[in-house]
Amino acid sequence: MLKRSIMTLYSGPLDIYSHQVRIVLAEKGVTVDIHNVDANHPSEDLIELNPYATLPTLVDRDLVLFESRVIMEYLDERFPHPPLLPVYPVARSRCRLLMYRIERNFYHSMKIIEEGTPKQAETEREFLTKELIELDPVFGEKTYFMNDDFTLVDCVMAPLLWRLPHLGVHVPPRAAKSMYKYKKLIFERESFKASLSESESELREVDGI
């Protein structure tokens, strides 16, 4: 493997896990060479670097990392400012658990909507709508999601919320005022806007923001 002089990210233009990492890179202001990859037809370069040929894959000189949360935590340690995880172990662990729960519950529903039968997809749309409405008070408790500072948890939550209209999930604004306020705050953040691929920008126009 050739040593690269600049950090390289193999990213899917519509891949939600790649989007997480792109937000972190933008938040940290890291110069990175982004290679857009079709996950169904990975390049030989990616296959050589990552035996699973999964996205995202990060190359930093001799280091190759895959799995979004591994990459995000590496970037947070490699570039400590601004910090995207709390200092104290208990708070850090809570953030990690939140990321796990968002992915296990909501990302799982997204996958079924995209790949399941029409009946399965509709069930998951109803589930996501109901869960987000019930979660609305939590969105209003802190400036960001369950924290006064922007964290990796927001880097996991934001890509999902961005994709809701594309997934056919329409949460009534009156039933989720705090969530819509949170979305507006996040979607207007410079790092989030910079993280969007051209394909992601085209996913949505306006969603009551």
From Swiss-Prot:
Pfam families: GST_C (PF00043), GST_N (PF02798)
CDD domains named among the record's database cross-references: GST_N_SspA
Classification via SUPFAM superfamilies: GST C-terminal domain-like (SSF47616), Thioredoxin-like (SSF52833)
GO CC, alphabetical: cytoplasm
GST C-terminal domain segment(s): 88-203
GST N-terminal domain segment(s): 5-83
InterPro entries, A to Z: Glutathione-S-Trfase_C-like (IPR010987), Glutathione-S-Trfase_C_sf (IPR036282), Glutathione_S-Trfase (IPR040079), Glutathione_S-Trfase_N (IPR004045), GST_C (IPR004046), GST_Omega/HSP26 (IPR050983), SspA_N (IPR034341), Thioredoxin-like_sf (IPR036249)
Assigned protein family: Belongs to the GST superfamily. HSP26 family.
Summary of the function given for this chain in its UniProt record: Forms an equimolar complex with the RNA polymerase holoenzyme (RNAP) but not with the core enzyme.
Protein name stated in the entry: Stringent starvation protein A homolog
Organism of derivation: Coxiella burnetii (strain RSA 493 / Nine Mile phase I)
Annotated gene: sspA
